Amino acid sequence: MKFTIMSKGDQSSDTLASTMKEYLLDFGFIMDEKEPDIVISVGGDGTLLYAFHRYYNRLDETAFVGVHTGHLGFYADWLPTEVEKLVIAIAKTPFQVVEYPLLEVIIRYVNGSKESQYLAMNEATVKSAEGTLVTEVEIRGEYFETFRGDGLCISTPSGSTAYNKALGGAIIHPSIEAIQIAEMASINNRVFRTVGSPLVLPKHHTCVLKPAAGMNLQITVDHLTMVHQDVKSIQYRVANEKVRFVRFRPFPFWKRVRDSFVADK
């Protein structure tokens, strides 16, 4: 089996990554940064997001597992003290693969140039680069509303505990193939109205944003931030691809939610 390790870059994470690499090589595993079967993320959720985007083009062949050394390890289910146990599990235990839905983002342009396509594991956001975002919102090909406000956040179920939660969105279990649209400071008065609530769209339902002409947009996809000009539309839907996580033991979603947001430390 081929593996690679991505570290957060701090001293403790680098030390753990080096230790795991030596252990796995001793077990006869092959270090392969280009085509790994397993990617081990050592850090926090941000490190795993970087790992996902590095290998997004081979999601059918690569699975991820995380060792938590960061501030929040929602995707990482192993502690630094369990590194030896994890290595032995990888070497000797048949593992289960759990799949999570992803968000597909397609940006199309007024001038007809080639569209830009992205995958998000947590969320994608859109804001105006110069003030209020004004955009038509279409759902399933039909006009839904005209949004005016700071921006919109479109999240995956696993990403619903991140920015989406801070915006008042619902937490969705990753077994549900859906995307969620949450507003950022929408303008609502006698003249302008939005639905004012997060929307949950199931698989095969598409949301298309059509921004006002001449608007420069700041678009994020997970940790990536870009400015796009001359945007005709942005399409969001549940992606055909899924991210795969290696599981050697139960890692209940609701327990993670409770431990992250409710349980006493």
From Swiss-Prot:
Query: Mainly localized where?
Result: cytoplasm
Q: Which GO terms describe its biological process?
A: NAD metabolic process; NADP biosynthetic process
Which residues of this UniProt protein bind NAD(+)?
Answer: D45, G46, N122, E123, R148, D150, A185
**Which Pfam family, just one, is annotated for this protein?**
NAD_kinase_C
Q: Which cofactor does it need?
A: a divalent metal cation
Q: Which domain of life is it from?
A: Bacteria
Which residues act catalytically here? D45
Residue ranges annotated as transmembrane are none
Q: What is its EC number?
A: 2.7.1.23
**What keywords were assigned to this record?**
ATP-binding, Cytoplasm, Kinase, NAD, NADP, Nucleotide-binding, Transferase
Which GO molecular function entries does the Swiss-Prot or TrEMBL record give? ATP binding; metal ion binding; NAD binding; NAD+ kinase activity
- Spell out the subcellular localization from the entry: Cytoplasm
Q: Name one GO cellular component term.
A: cytoplasm
SUPFAM superfamilies the record matches: NAD kinase/diacylglycerol kinase-like (SSF111331)
> Which catalytic reaction applies to this protein?
NAD(+) + ATP = ADP + NADP(+) + H(+)
Functional note: Involved in the regulation of the intracellular balance of NAD and NADP, and is a key enzyme in the biosynthesis of NADP. Catalyzes specifically the phosphorylation on 2'-hydroxyl of the adenosine moiety of NAD to yield NADP.
Family assignment from sequence similarity: Belongs to the NAD kinase family.
Q: What is this protein called?
A: NAD kinase 1
The protein's organism comes out as Bacillus cereus (strain ATCC 14579 / DSM 31 / CCUG 7414 / JCM 2152 / NBRC 15305 / NCIMB 9373 / NCTC 2599 / NRRL B-3711)
Lineage of the species this protein comes from = Bacteria, Bacillati, Bacillota, Bacilli, Bacillales
